[in-house]
Regions:
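Conserved phosphate- and dinucleotide-binding cores of soluble alpha/beta proteins
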Residues: 1-144
Length: 145
């Protein structure tokens, strides 16, 4: 996932002025019943530690990926809504879901605080109802896994 915007659109093909090309992404993503985007919350320079208490964001990346409007729409949230697709956006810090009302924050990682580690690094405010905690076993240090 290169960028996601406040509407749930995703850009995977045109990042920072570089044309990458979507390949077969369009055919697969637009025709699937459920689409799960996975990627980091931000890019370039983030430093994240896995501790027994969960994630510790020592430094956020320099390039935000949750933006007001994507540079190019490779995945259309409006089309997904019209076709009844279920859409999830998974990052190490949070999980978002596309709803009829917009992008909703549905899960956060252990150790992450919404006001400290998520909202200041997003260009929009997602719908926040009752986000649950991600499964803590997902964040075990590699030597313990």
């Amino acid at each position: 996932m290169g960028e996601m915007d406040q509407y749930g659109n995703v850009n995977v093909s045109h990042l920072n002025g570089n044309l990458i090309g979507p390949g077969g992404f369009l055919e697969i993503a637009q025709n699937a019943r459920k689409v799960v985007f996975c990627g980091t919350f931000d890019a370039k320079g983030s430093k994240i530690d896995v501790t027994p208490d969960g994630l510790h964001i020592a430094q956020s990346g320099q390039i935000p990926k949750l933006v007001t409007q994507v540079e190019k729409i490779t995945f259309s949230a409006a089309y997904a809504q019209q076709s009844g697709q279920e859409v999830l956006y998974i990052t190490e810090r949070a999980v978002f879901q596309l709803t009829a009302e917009g992008v909703e924050l549905i899960e956060i990682a252990p150790g992450v605080e919404i006001e400290r580690d998520i909202l200041p690094y997003m260009a929009f405010r997602p719908i926040i109802r009752h986000p649950r905690l991600m499964e803590s076993s997902l964040f075990m240090p590699m030597e313990d896994a």
